């Protein structure tokens, strides 16, 4: 038996992300499943606002050479099929969506950007990376009296759940 990594996140979009598409062949067991219940979460949509000078300061903390003159210099270059940002350009720098999420402490990399000259708004859907088990949907399944095995099999079909006895180190 092989132990698999089973990632989780708080709230996603209408579907979880596809592990094979995102991370490669070794994560083919992380398939995209319906998480439409996430839309009912109070944390499904979040607006995060930054003045241009604050945005610049936050990025410069990690990238000293970062320059941006106008909020209009922020452009999403690539998203996955669910809308998670894969690549975004800001000023003189390109970033991965997850990297931008970490730099700005955004709830999710599933976002759109709206700007005027001095203000930037990130309209984010979900909380977390969207890969694996949605805690919100899993919680709703539990409220419907689904057992943990059924919940795990829904998010990770094809994986076998086994009991493992842990030995104490003496």
Task: Identify the role of each PLM range.
Residues 1-170:
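Conserved, single-site charged/polar hotspot
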């Amino acid at each position: 038996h092989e132990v698999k990594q089973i990632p989780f996140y708080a709230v996603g979009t209408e579907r979880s992300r596809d592990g094979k598409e995102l991370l490669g062949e070794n994560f083919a067991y992380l398939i995209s499943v319906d998480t439409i219940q996430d839309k009912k979460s109070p944390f499904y949509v979040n607006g995060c606002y930054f003045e241009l000078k604050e945005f610049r300061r936050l990025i410069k903390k990690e990238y000293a050479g970062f320059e941006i003159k106008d909020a209009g210099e922020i452009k999403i270059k690539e998203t996955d099929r669910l809308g998670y940002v894969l690549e975004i350009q800001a000023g003189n720098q390109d970033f991965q969506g997850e990297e931008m999420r970490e730099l700005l402490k955004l709830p999710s990399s599933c976002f759109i950007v709206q700007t005027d000259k001095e203000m930037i708004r990130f309209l984010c859907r979900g909380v977390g990376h969207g890969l694996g088990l949605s805690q919100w949907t899993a919680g709703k399944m539990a409220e419907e009296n689904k057992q943990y095995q059924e919940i795990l099999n829904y998010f990770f079909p094809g994986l076998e759940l086994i009991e493992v006895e842990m030995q104490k180190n003496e």
